Amino acid sequence: MMKVLVVVALLVTLISYSSSEGIDDLEADELLSLMANEQTRAKACTPRYYDCSHDRHSCCRSSMFKDVCTCFYPEGGDNKEVCTCQQPKHLKYMEKATDKIKNLFG
């Protein structure tokens, strides 16, 4: 049993060492250019209660959860769909509960 544990520990050490060597092979310039490309891809999020019909995955995050683009047909006979970023009620209650717990123990 002890031999098996030693072999497993040796394998884990070798695997972690080989993966860290691969990271060291990247040059700093390449890593910086990759990060710059990632930052340019980020787009502005849509605030709560604003129109999100142009991009339904663009809603901003609250302190804990991401808002959801909710679509509905308003009353009044107009059959045009309206979409806004909203926070679901169950997530709203969860955020309030965690805030109260943090204030109680924090």
UniProtKB/Swiss-Prot annotation:
A Gene Ontology term for the protein's cellular component: extracellular region
Any Pfam family: Toxin_35
Keywords: Disulfide bond, Knottin, Secreted, Signal, Toxin
Presence of the UniProt keyword Transcription in the record: no
Annotated tissue distribution: Expressed by the venom gland.
Positions of the propeptide segment: 21-41
Subcellular location: Secreted
Protein name, UniProt field: Toxin-like structure LSTX-D3
Species: Lycosa singoriensis (Wolf spider)
